[in-house]
Amino acid sequence: MHYLTVQDVLWIHLQIAKKPGKFSFANLEEATSYQYAYGKSHDVMSQAARFFGGFATKAPFDSANRTVAFVAGVVFLELNGRHFNPKEKDLGAWLDRAVNQPTSNEAIEESTIASTDSHPVECRDVAKAVLEKYEAAIKKLLE
């Protein structure tokens, strides 16, 4: 399993907000830790669901928390062999489903496919690709 660090999430927030923002370090650490599972970590979908929902709920930043949750969650999926391929055009509506515990696993499973890439990837490279690919959706999430 590959995980984002607190520093990775701070970097993602900086790319989205375009300026350093205020944040609660304790909440940021807790929000970032939602990607982990107890015991053996092998269930990417459940861990991603916890990460999307937990990060959005913890809201460690003074702005753009849902958007950071979206980007960081997609990066987590991509790092762990799940290619994000949403069928929904409205990623805001998709994110609402992904952060809502009863529907989160379903939303994530419907929107990902197993990746055929087997080479190691760097978190920031994946994040840059996600930020570029979903630039329009990210702008819309920030509105």
Q: What are the roles of these predicted feature ranges?
A:
Residues 1-143:
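FIC/Doc superfamily catalytic core
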